[in-house]
């Protein structure tokens, strides 16, 4: 599934987020003509209706610890297909991002850390 939330994201559900070879997959996916301008790649698994394990490989950067736009893309997609409720937490290697949908608005909350 792809989503546009200010920047493009390819979202792929996998069985084991931690062991999936994201770097190799990202190189292969970005070679496709449909992604000629680059794309951020999210791999994920829904743990429960409230928790989503995820990792991200951002175009031009590589794998990062977390991604706000990626979390929004995942949340909106999974909410649309009724896999999560109106509140969910995306669990990235770098920390948790809390997402909610209230009165036709999306909210994203998380800790900011400078690296």
What function would you assign to each model-found segment?
Residues 1-66, 73-115:
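Active-site proximal loop and beta-alpha junction motif in alpha/beta enzyme cores
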């Amino acid at each position: 599934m792809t989503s546009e939330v200010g920047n493009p994201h390819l979202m792929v559900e996998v069985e084991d987020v931690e062991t999936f070879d994201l770097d190799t997959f990202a190189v292969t996916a970005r070679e496709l003509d449909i992604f000629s301008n680059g794309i951020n790649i999210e791999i994920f698994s829904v743990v429960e209706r409230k928790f989503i394990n995820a990792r991200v490989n951002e175009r031009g950067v590589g794998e990062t610890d977390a991604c706000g736009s990626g979390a929004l893309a995942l949340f909106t997609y999974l909410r649309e297909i009724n896999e999560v409720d109106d509140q969910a937490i995306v669990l990235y290697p770098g920390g948790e991002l809390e997402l909610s949908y209230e009165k036709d608005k999306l909210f994203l909350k998380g800790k900011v850390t400078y690296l």
